[in-house]
Amino acid sequence: MHTVKLLCVVFSCLCAIGWASHHSHRQPCHSPQLTSGTMKVVSTGGHDLASGEFSYDSKTNKFRFVEDTTHANKTSYMDVLIHFEEGVLYEIDSKNESCKKETLQFRKHLMEIPVDATHESESYMGSPSLTEQGLRVRVWNGKFPELHAHYSLSTTSCGCLTVSGSYYGEKKDLFFSFFGVETEVDDLQVFAPPAYCEGVSFEEAPDDHSFFDLFHD
């Protein structure tokens, strides 16, 4: 297991160089090819919206999220597979072996920093002087004009792992947190739709249908 440690030790020299760079000219970094861990989503009002295991392939831009069935008392739980490059969203019901397939016109999300994001700041969470008691993060901001929304992302300075993200839209505000992130995915088949999804017809969705629509009260 290649568990990612929050405090950058091995790359401390590289981080120091990056720290000295002029922040306003920093270009968005790229996340590792494969990441997995736990993702939690809450509304800014404090309501838990979803919590579960995520897997992300940054090279193919594919994302899988399976909600933890023990997290909350719900009648249904989320299992989604998104192929962002192709603009396809699968809602999977493995219990009943059924599948819903939708078009996804808006293809940006918070697992990857958008190329037009602006670097806002770099700082420590916790203590910068105590061993393994702090985390250096970079904060990125930007807008999603198509959604009339804006966002903020925090990533590790070394490794470009997403730590947290905020989405502020006309209809909802969301806060994303990522825990126990590893730079591997145990089973790459999580990025392939189940066989029972084959032959399922597309359900057309509005042009502003997005990843963020999955999370609501």
Swiss-Prot record:
Q: Does the keyword Transcription regulation apply?
A: no
Residue positions with a glycan = N73, N96
Which tissue types show expression of this protein?
EPDs are synthesized in the meninx and secreted in the cerebrospinal fluid.
Q: Which Pfam families match?
A: Ependymin (PF00811)
**What post-translational changes are documented for it?**
Binds calcium through the terminal sialic acids.
Quote the subcellular location field of this record: Secreted
Give the signal peptide, or none: 1-20
User: Where is it predominantly found?
Assistant: secreted
Subunit comment: Forms disulfide-linked dimers.
Q: Which family does it belong to?
A: Belongs to the ependymin family.
Record-given protein name: Ependymin
| Native source organism of the sequence | Danio rerio
Instruction: Name the gene.
Output: epd
